[in-house]
Amino acid sequence: MFGRVFIVAVLYCITICKGEDPTNSSTPKLILLSFDGFRADYLTRFPMPNLQEFMKEGVEVEEVKNVFITKTFPNHYSLVTGLYAESHGIVANRMYDADTKQVFHMNDSHSKWWDEATPIWLTNQKQGHRSGCAMWPGSDVSIHNTTPSDFLYYNHTVSFAQRVNHITTWLTRPNDSINFAAIYWEEPDASGHRYGPDDYGNMSGVLKEVDKNVGYLMSELKKANLWDTVNVIITSDHGMAQCSNDRIIKLNDCIGPGNYTLVDDNPVASILPISDTKNVYDLLRNCHPHMKVYMKEEIPDRWHYKHNSRIQPLLLVADEGWMITQNESISMLGDHGYDNDLHSMHPFLAAHGPAFRKSYKMRTINNVDVYPMMCLILGITGQPNNGTLSNTKCLLANQWCIQVSEAIGIVIGAIMVLTTLTCIIIMLKKKMPSARPFSRLQFQDDDDPLIG
């Protein structure tokens, strides 16, 4: 009897040490939700009561540094693979593969474009679980000949509520429920392009609807008794910069259209030269003061954007707020794709659930860091990736962590304490009376004199 009790006690302790709830032995569940084009500072510029409530009970990352180029498809694939664009192969929303001579558009469902990486929904399934995706870019493609266990083909007319309802149904099925879900929603990106992020009047209405969607998700999870057991991550792919019809760079003003093919444009243009590459480069290099031109091999290393055959020989990058076209005007007032160091390009991240701390705020992480964190939450072994788990450990409830600022504070504090103690010791030594010279030769009362 004592032996059985001892074994049960040991197993209980092991469960506690692993950071699991001993009253809930079910597989950890996780929802990843992306609101396309949700710029980080929207959180401080617009009222969002539901999202604020969500973060108050969970964690917030004020800015997420995304991957270059700061476009929809590259960043959504980075979130679910933990890879830079050059590594996962979805380098733009429009691509040309020099090896196969084929062109990719956003509605292309051929798996060859996606097979350079393995998204988390497939890794989760390969390790004995089930995944469900509602419109997440690439989730309706048979990647490595496999689709999510449950998924919806992309259809922009399907409402946010319908997408959430599918997910909650998949999560609560009695026998074959999913444990990982990914949801994509097109706003506020579509309206950000139309109005620009600085149009407070129009964008406030758009973001009010986005916040209502957050409230709907919270409500449905509570109705399904999932709120306290499911982990939810809300984030985005990129931000948005204010643009203008007065800030347009027309390439045909600098070079004849017969000299090149424009693979992708606005505000980062991929150029496939038809004539001599060096000649095209020289013509474009001095085209406009608000546009930088790079040979492929000269693309800055910090962008991790040169080691893939789908990246073209020339890359044109506009300054923030400027747009690149061949010859036409552009009606939209907001855009993204710019340098990923720009704050206007950064999204945010918020998370809630048993895996996360309560009321905790962090300044920044990289979006490739989200993947290893999700793998840890799900209890699966991830694929090789560019993310760093230690960057997100402070967000997690069962992980010990110390931020750089805290570490610096501890070091400075220790130095101050040691310095103070050293000064005190030196001062005390100075105050102590020193022995008189030759005191050892002084006669005591009972000493005999040397001379009688």
Swiss-Prot record:
Record's SUPFAM superfamilies?
Alkaline phosphatase-like
Q: Read off the CDD domains from this record.
A: Enpp (cd16018)
- Function of the protein: Hydrolyzes extracellular Ap3A into AMP and ADP, and Ap4A into AMP and ATP. Ap3A and Ap4A are diadenosine polyphosphates thought to induce proliferation of vascular smooth muscle cells. Acts as a procoagulant, mediating platelet aggregation at the site of nascent thrombus via release of ADP from Ap3A and activation of ADP receptors.
Q: Give the organism the record lists.
A: Xenopus laevis (African clawed frog)
Known Gene3D superfamilies for this protein? 3.30.1360.180, Alkaline Phosphatase, subunit A
- What remark does the entry make about the cofactor? Binds 2 Zn(2+) ions per subunit.
Keyword Iron (UniProt):
no
Residue spans, topological domain Extracellular:
20-407
Subcellular localization is given as: Cell membrane
Tell me which family the UniProt entry assigns to this protein: Belongs to the nucleotide pyrophosphatase/phosphodiesterase family.
> What does the record give as the organism's lineage?
Eukaryota, Metazoa, Chordata, Craniata, Vertebrata
Q: Which domain of life is it from?
A: Eukaryota
Please state what the protein is called.
Bis(5'-adenosyl)-triphosphatase enpp4
Which amino acids does the record list as binding Zn(2+) 1? Answer: D36, T72, D237, H238
Report the EC number(s), separated by commas if there are several: 3.6.1.29
